[in-house]
Amino acid sequence: MKVILKENLDNLGHIGDIVKVAPGYARNYLLPKGLALEATTKNAKALDHAKKHLEYKKNKVLEQARQFAARIEGIALTLSHQAGEEGKLFGAVTNMELAENLKAQGVEIDRKKIVLAEPIKQVGDFTAIIKIHPEVNATLKVTVTKA
């Protein structure tokens, strides 16, 4: 029996693939759980239309992510922390602190999306990577000064 997959399945294929499976597997598992549709011309046309719509939405989200990344890259954060004689900070600058400072500047982002290559424990200039979308990353410039 031929079916059209509605979801990615490790053992069968990806969304939209037309695969041949055992009739019992299709009737008892794939179709009742909504993982696949019977492969008819009507269902194939409906799936093509849904694919085009999803592609349009994906491109729109990607463009919004790129605009958001450009907005973030235009920001330079300056933080002042207490530091010792040699510029070593008492504590460290965390991604949570960076998220709070970005929020104060009108850019709200989840702290888990901010990636620091290494903890910021010195006075100086640093960069942080912000993962906005699986295909779009932004670079944030962070300057830490002595308070």
Swiss-Prot record:
The answer to whether keyword Ribonucleoprotein applies is yes
One GO CC annotation:
ribosome
Q: Pfam families, alphabetically?
A: Ribosomal_L9_C, Ribosomal_L9_N
Source domain of life: Bacteria
The GO terms this record gives for MF are: rRNA binding; structural constituent of ribosome
The record's comment on protein family reads: Belongs to the bacterial ribosomal protein bL9 family.
The protein here is known as Large ribosomal subunit protein bL9
**What organism is this sequence from?**
Geotalea daltonii (strain DSM 22248 / JCM 15807 / FRC-32)
